[in-house]
């Protein structure tokens, strides 16, 4: 016959420690049981009393706010930063010495096509080893469909980085109209709007276009505005591979800004560049257009990739 000796550590429920002792336990025998209990409880208490789970000490912090780099400690509890400052007198379960190292938030890669490889290499070391912890996909008007099924696949794959997607205007158009080069009917436009609504409700960041590519190139500006209004109603953004990045780049920037104004949606001009040596210098004008739009109250941003493509 075994008797249970159950000890609650700091009032924990259910009990954290349970020992089975064969036969009755006399008071004289209890002293031999109490000593290991005391040791175990002391160890557990010392662990649970730590101020932080992790402290990153003496790192050069660049926090993304625009402020200059500074040296400090970072305290983490339950995977969340809870304090930044001098934590030299605080206790921690684990210490990371970041002396002469840079500590920053993980980078967000705002334009990827990582869906082409994320299921083959779910750990995504090529991104993580560069400090990129969030990948966005669904760019250039092409996205997974439907979004909710895609997120379930991502969840099942247990990928390492954070993951976000846009709903692609080209994907939605193709779903409703195929690759036909014409304007949508009223009912077709309504169907596309409903699909954008469903995607936003399933967690899309916003709507993307690839107006340089088929079938996005078949779409009038008014069609894009209608779909962007749906995304805007859910707090989404509009990100675009514009129609033209060469001689007519100014028209494309103006179109992109106009979509933002009409749909009342923040705008991101993706991989902005000027293609063709004969067009170099037009970036002065494109940036002026963007600056003017920002001064007028529209949220406009630009991303670029760090390699030659013009």
Annotate each predicted stretch with a short phrase.
Residues 44-46:
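C-terminal motif of bacterial Sec signal peptides marking the signal peptidase cleavage site
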Residues 7-17, 23-25:
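Positively charged N-terminal leader segments that act as targeting/secretion signals
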Residues 106-117, 238-244:
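Histidine-centered catalytic micro-motifs
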Residues 98-103, 107-112, 120-209, 228-229, ...:
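Divalent-metal coordination cores built from histidine and acidic residues
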Residues 51-54, 61-105:
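Histidine-rich, glycine-flanked metal-binding segment
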Residues 184-209, 215-310:
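Histidine/acidic residue-rich metal-binding segments in metalloenzymes
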Residues 31-38:
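Sec-dependent signal peptide recognition
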């Amino acid at each position: 016959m075994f008797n249970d000796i159950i000890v609650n550590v700091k009032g924990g429920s259910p009990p954290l420690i349970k020992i089975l002792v064969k036969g009755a336990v006399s008071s004289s025998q209890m002293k031999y049981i109490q000593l290991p209990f005391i040791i175990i409880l002391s160890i557990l208490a010392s662990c649970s009393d730590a101020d932080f789970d992790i402290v990153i000490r003496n790192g050069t912090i660049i926090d993304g706010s625009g402020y200059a780099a500074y040296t400090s400690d970072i305290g983490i509890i339950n995977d969340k930063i809870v304090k930044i400052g001098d934590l030299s007198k605080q206790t921690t379960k684990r210490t990371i010495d970041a002396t002469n190292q840079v500590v920053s938030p993980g980078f967000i890669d705002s334009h990827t096509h990582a869906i082409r490889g994320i299921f083959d290499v779910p750990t995504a070391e090529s991104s993580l080893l560069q400090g990129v912890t969030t990948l966005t996909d669904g760019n250039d008007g092409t996205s997974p469909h439907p979004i909710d099924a895609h997120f379930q696949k991502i969840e099942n794959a247990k990928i390492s980085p954070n993951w976000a997607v846009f709903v692609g205007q080209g994907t939605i158009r193709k779903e409703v109209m195929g690759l036909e080069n014409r304007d949508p009917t009223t009912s077709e436009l309504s169907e596309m709007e409903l699909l954008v609504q469903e995607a936003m409700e399933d967690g899309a960041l916003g709507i993307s276009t690839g107006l340089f590519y088929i079938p996005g190139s078949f779409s009038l500006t008014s069609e894009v505005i209608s779909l962007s209004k749906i995304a805007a109603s859910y707090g989404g953004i509009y990100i675009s591979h514009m129609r033209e990045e060469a001689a007519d780049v100014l028209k494309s920037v103006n179109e992109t800004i106009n979509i933002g104004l009409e749909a009342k949606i923040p705008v991101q001009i993706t991989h902005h560049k000027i293609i063709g040596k004969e067009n170099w210098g037009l970036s002065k004008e494109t940036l002026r257009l963007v600056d003017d739009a920002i001064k007028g109250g529209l949220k406009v941003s630009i991303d670029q990739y760090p390699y030659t493509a013009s």
